[in-house]
Design a protein with these regions (language model features):
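Short, surface-exposed patches at the edges or C-terminal ends of soluble domains, predominantly
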Residues: 1-338
Length: 338
C-alpha cells in the first residue's frame, strides 16, 4: 500500500547508493529489489567521491581498514549533509568453524567521531532465532532446531524515535554492543531484551546449550544494538545523519537482508532521513512477524499444572453432577411407583 501511494505522489525518484569498499564482496540483491520499487538504486565504490545527487548511502560492515580515499570520501559525504546507514559489528564470525575474530579497521575511529563506540563483544539474547543442531536419536542422526542467542530477535524499540515507531520485530546476526558518547547528539533506536548477556575475549559459539553454559546466564539488561547520530558541520551549519546497526550483514542476502521485517526498518530509516516520515506508521502495520508473548518460567509452570488439573477436575465435577441427577431421577421413579 505504502509503495503504491508513494508512486502516485512522487514525480522524481530519490537516488540511493549501495556503497562498498575495494575489499567487500557482499551480495545485496534482496534489499536492492525492495528499494528499486521506490528509488533509483546505484552501486558505488568509495574510492571515488560520492555523487552529489545521492540522498542516502547504505554500507555493509567492513572487515579491513579503509583506504585514505575511501575514508575521506565517506567523511566528506556526511560532513556535507549526507545520510549514511551502516551495519557494522566488532567481530568477524564464521559459524561453520565457530570462530570469532576481532575486526581491525579505522572504521571504528570514524564512527567514534559520530558518537558511536562499538564494543569488542557479542551480544546474546534469550529472544532469538534458531539453528539446526545435529544430534543422535537412537541409531539416527537428525537436525534438531535449537534457540541460538547469538541471533537476537529485536522487540525493544525506542518509541520516541519515528524510525522504529510501530515496529514489532527485527532480526540480527552476531551483533556487538554499542556505547553512545554523551558529547554527541545520539539517540537509541533499538536494543536487546532484558534477558541478555555479552561474550568477550573467548568466544564459544557452539549452539548446543549442553556445552555452552552462557545460554543459561542471560540475565542482564538490554544492550544497545542500533542508534542514530546527528552530525553538525560547525562551519556551514549543515547537519548530516548516521544510523548504525551493529550487525555487519544487516543488508546482505546471507544475513538480515532476507528478512521482510528488516526491509521495513530500512525503508523507514530512508524515509526518515529524507524528511518523509508520514508513511512510516502505515508501513509498520505491514509487519508480518507477530510473535507470541514470552512467559516467565513460573508462569509456564502454573499454566502447565492448570492444563493437567483443570480438565480432570472438570470431568470429576461433571461426573458428580450426572451422579446426582441419576439419584434424583431414581428417587422420583420410586415415589411414582410406590
Amino acid at each position: 500500500i505504502t509503495t503504491n501511494i508513494k508512486k502516485l505522489v512522487d514525480s522524481n525518484k530519490e537516488s540511493i547508493a549501495i556503497a562498498s569498499t575495494s575489499t567487500q564482496t557482499e551480495v545485496n540483491e534482496n534489499i536492492i529489489q525492495i528499494l528499486r520499487q521506490r528509488f533509483n538504486v546505484r552501486n558505488i565504490i568509495l574510492d571515488s567521491a560520492v555523487p552529489v545527487d545521492i540522498s542516502v548511502v547504505l554500507l555493509n560492515g567492513v572487515s579491513d581498514s579503509l583506504s585514505v580515499d575511501e575514508r575521506q570520501n565517506l567523511e566528506n559525504y556526511v560532513t556535507n549533509g549526507g545520510n549514511l546507514i551502516i551495519g557494522q559489528n566488532r567481530l568477524a564470525v564464521d559459524i561453520q568453524t565457530q570462530q570469532a575474530t576481532p575486526i581491525i579497521s579505522d572504521i571504528f575511529e570514524l564512527l567514534s567521531n559520530y558518537g558511536f563506540q562499538i564494543e569488542e563483544n557479542l551480544v546474546l539474547d534469550k529472544t532469538c532465532g534458531k539453528v539446526n543442531v545435529q544430534q543422535n536419536m537412537g541409531i539416527f542422526r537428525m537436525a534438531v532446531p535449537m534457540d541460538y542467542p547469538f541471533l537476537p530477535i529485536i522487540q525493544t524499540f525506542n518509541e520516541d524515535e519515528v524510525v522504529v515507531s510501530g515496529l514489532e520485530g527485527l532480526r540480527t546476526m552476531f551483533p556487538s554492543e554499542i556505547t553512545l558518547d554523551s558529547l554527541h547528539n545520539t539517540m537509541i533506536l533499538f536494543q536487546s531484551s532484558d534477558h541478555s548477556s555479552t561474550m568477550s575475549e573467548f568466544y564459544n559459539l557452539n549452539p548446543d546449550p549442553k556445552v555452552n553454559p552462557v545460554f543459561s546466564q542471560l540475565n542482564e539488561n538490554g544492550k544497545i544494538l542500533a542508534a542514530r547520530s546527528e552530525v553538525l558541520n560547525n562551519e556551514t551549519g549543515i547537519v548530516g545523519q548516521v544510523i548504525l546497526i551493529s550487525d555487519s550483514k544487516f543488508f546482505a542476502d546471507n544475513g538480515g537482508g532476507g528478512s521482510p521485517e528488516n526491509h521495513i526498518f530500512v525503508l523507514n530509516a530512508i524515509d526518515f532521513l529524507l524528511g518523509d516520515s508520514e508513511l512510516i506508521s502505515l508501513r509498520s502495520r505491514e509487519i508480518t512477524n507477530r510473535p507470541l508473548e514470552e512467559l516467565e518460567d513460573d508462569a509456564k509452570v502454573q499454566w502447565k499444572w492448570a492444563n493437567i488439573l483443570l480438565p480432570s477436575l472438570f470431568i470429576v465435577g461433571f461426573g458428580f453432577i450426572r451422579l446426582r441427577g441419576e439419584k434424583n431421577r431414581a428417587a422420583m421413579l420410586e415415589e411414582l411407583y410406590d
